[in-house]
């Protein structure tokens, strides 16, 4: 007989395991998903790291403060952003932690602020040449006179869930 009591139990257990494996991410989503809308990305600082007068290339260092007011921990695998200076697109940046294990990525602990540092190299173009010239001419004073803003998105991860968070900030 093909369907003995043992085989029926075996097929039932295998079926339950398969259903659990398939639906586990959905269950975790509803149980452990943090509200990514409350996680706050702020552009904390823009500093000049290096100026190359020969090529007019400028390397900037950006600091993002990430505040997590929720009661669940989270982390990020990638932050993509567009940097604007005086409402002119200066460049696109990517801060990636995708090749780093979860325990080595920046942790957004409940009620805490984490700081992320990113470098971006500005390439001169007709659109942004006045901002680059302003930075080259007097780097210490001019960086404070420029209106910096950033628009971007981040992949927020918690347990088995990856959610997209859009952000925008002005400095």
Task: Label each PLM-derived region with a short phrase.
Residues 1-54, 126, 155, 159-171:
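Membrane engagement elements in two modes
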Residues 50-52, 64-70:
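Asparagine-centered strand-capping/turn motif at beta-strand->loop junctions
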Residues 56-63:
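Short, solvent-exposed loop/turn segments enriched in Ser/Thr/Gly
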Residues 72-80, 92-94:
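Short, hydrophobic/aromatic beta-strand segments
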Residues 80-88:
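Short edge-strand/loop segments of extracellular domains
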Residues 122-171:
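Terminal connector regions
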């Amino acid at each position: 007989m093909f369907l003995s009591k043992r085989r029926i139990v075996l097929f039932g257990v295998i079926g339950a395991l398969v259903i659990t494996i398939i639906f586990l991410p959905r269950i975790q989503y509803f149980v452990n998903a943090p509200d990514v809308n409350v996680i706050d990305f702020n552009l904390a600082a823009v500093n000049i790291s290096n100026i190359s007068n020969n090529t007019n290339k400028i390397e900037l260092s950006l600091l993002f403060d990430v505040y997590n007011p929720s009661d669940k921990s989270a982390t990020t695998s990638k932050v993509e952003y567009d940097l604007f200076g005086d409402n002119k697109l200066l460049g696109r940046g990517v801060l990636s932690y995708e090749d780093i294990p979860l325990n080595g990525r920046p942790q957004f602990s409940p009620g805490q602020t984490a700081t992320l540092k990113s470098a971006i190299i500005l390439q001169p173009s007709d659109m942004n040449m006045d901002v680059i010239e302003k930075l080259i001419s007097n780097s210490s004073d001019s960086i404070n006179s420029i209106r910096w803003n950033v628009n971007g998105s981040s992949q927020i991860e918690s347990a088995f869930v990856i959610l997209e968070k859009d952000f925008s900030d002005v400095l």
